[in-house]
């Protein structure tokens, strides 16, 4: 009954503001650019824009578009209106976009260049905007797209830049957008997060507000019944920080919830708790034998193509719009079924038994309550060689984690520049597993690695390298000081920590 009344109220609100719906506009400005030489070609780079393109075609800088739409509306078309066109001096041969390739493929690959595009005496791209879609974040309908302010004639080498671009999005009423309004949150923290994500936060004021419920709480823990009483230290930890916690079991959800399987019942329960009680965090207590995962489908267009229909993804439990399987087949998360804007934060304690759970709880509480202060500003970066064509290293991406950055279309504030950075970069020299172990043994708060991996291999280390004897200095500190190894290792690569394959 409560949700029926909510939907009725939202529909009435939308009727009142319908006269203001229909068109959303924003103007973007571009003044600075730089030209980078790459293997006899040129790359045109603009701060804050992502350099990309279709494989074999010119790689150009693209601006992201993230515009809040009127409540209950979806985006139906996008228009690019460029002005103050500036002709760049000289003639250019813009670098063709190359495909990503797994390390397992032999050789350096074939250099991709679409000759028909490069021989055409016409401006590229024919359409300046990318695909347009309507996404939803915490109840707000958002037009997602991109555009390039660059015009390029491959035949003549002429390049021009629009210094001002107006983007116009036309909207229309949509039932899916009305339904998404159920996910409007009363949390100021969530509203602030949405406002930082979008580019026209003033439009958010046209959305209905939601009052806090008397039953609101912050964090939900879902675990197996046998572990329900083992999370008190975690609950106390968060209560001390002003985060209220409730716990339930998968058995309760399975017996009382709705859905075709346990994973869907858990997701539906999370949706109810988010909409009715305002939760912002979910902790899944247990590995997949205790709390199931949802396997997603993906086809990667690289080389001969790679396909997987069972990629474990807890994003299913945090991105709460839609069903992730609109056509009810055996492929979850196909194109058009996905929801890549999560409403809440979801984490998982991947334990199988009580011993592992107690260890994870001990590490979690000790890390927050008793940090090793002398190591807090010590960080190790480990970057491998990634690809030859174009030449790419992990260090290219690791450097973007330091301080303020606005590369690739994202604005980030990373690890403070005042920290001590210990860098193992193959861009400047070789390094080995022994070098990385020495860094860990020296005491590092964060270890960030970008390279190649598999389910049993990472950072030049295999399963056999994870032995006590290889981390003797850490263990010596633990024995003498009754503390423990306090270090996070974060890795960006393919199938690392692929626990489903073990």
Locations of regions flagged by a protein language model:
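Cysteine-dependent hydrolase recognition
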Residues: 20-502
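Positively charged n-region of N-terminal signal peptides that target proteins for export
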Residues: 1-4
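Bacterial N-terminal signal peptides
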Residues: 8-17
């Amino acid at each position: 009954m409560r949700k029926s009344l909510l939907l009725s109220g939202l529909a009435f609100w939308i009727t009142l503001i319908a006269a203001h719906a229909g068109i959303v506009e924003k103007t973007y400005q571009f003044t600075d650019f730089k030209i980078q030489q790459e293997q006899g070609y040129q790359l045109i780079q603009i701060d804050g824009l992502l350099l990309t393109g279709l494989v074999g075609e010119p790689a150009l800088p693209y601006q992201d578009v993230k515009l809040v739409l009127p409540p209950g509306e979806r985006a139906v078309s996008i228009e690019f209106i460029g002005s103050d066109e500036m002709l760049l001096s000289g003639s250019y041969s813009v670098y063709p976009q190359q495909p990503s390739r797994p390390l397992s493929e032999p050789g350096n690959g074939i250099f991709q260049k679409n000759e028909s595009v490069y021989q055409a005496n016409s401006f590229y791209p024919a359409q300046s905007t990318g695909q347009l879609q309507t996404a939803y974040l915490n109840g707000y309908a958002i037009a997602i797209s991109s555009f390039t302010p660059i015009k390029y004639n491959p035949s003549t080498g002429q390049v021009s830049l629009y210094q001002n671009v107006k983007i116009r999005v036309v909207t229309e009423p949509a039932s899916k957008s009305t339904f998404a309004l159920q996910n409007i949150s009363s949390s100021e923290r969530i509203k602030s997060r949405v406002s930082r994500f979008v580019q026209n936060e003033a439009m958010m004021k046209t959305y209905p507000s939601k009052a806090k419920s008397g039953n609101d709480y912050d964090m939900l823990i879902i675990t197996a019944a046998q572990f329900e009483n083992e999370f008190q230290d975690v609950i106390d930890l968060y209560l001390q920080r002003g985060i209220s916690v409730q716990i339930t079991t998968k058995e309760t959800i399975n017996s009382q919830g709705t859905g075709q399987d346990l994973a869907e019942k858990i997701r539906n329960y999370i949706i109810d708790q988010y909409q009715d009680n305002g939760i912002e965090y979910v902790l899944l207590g247990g590995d997949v034998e205790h709390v199931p995962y949802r396997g997603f489908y993906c086809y990667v267009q690289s080389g001969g193509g790679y396909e997987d229909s069972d990629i474990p993804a807890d994003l299913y439990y945090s991105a709460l719009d839609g069903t992730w399987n609109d056509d009810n087949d055996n492929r979850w998360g196909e194109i058009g079924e996905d929801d890549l804007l999560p409403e809440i934060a979801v984490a998982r304690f991947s334990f199988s038994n009580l011993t592992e759970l107690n260890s994870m709880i001990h590490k979690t509480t000790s890390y927050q309550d008793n940090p090793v202060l002398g190591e807090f500003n010590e960080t190790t970066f480990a970057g491998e060689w990634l690809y030859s064509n174009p030449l790419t290293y992990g260090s290219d991406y690791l450097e973007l984690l330091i301080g303020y950055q606005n590369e690739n279309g994202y604005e980030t504030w990373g690890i403070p520049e005042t920290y001590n950075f210990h860098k193992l970069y193959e861009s400047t020299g070789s390094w080995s597993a022994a070098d990385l172990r020495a860094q860990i043994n020296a005491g590092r708060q964060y270890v960030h690695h970008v390279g190649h991996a598999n389910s049993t291999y990472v950072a030049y280390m295999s399963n056999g390298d994870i032995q006590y004897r290889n981390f003797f200095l850490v263990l010596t500190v633990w024995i003498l000081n009754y503390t423990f190894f306090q270090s996070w290792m974060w890795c960006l690569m393919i199938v690392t920590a692929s626990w489903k394959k073990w």
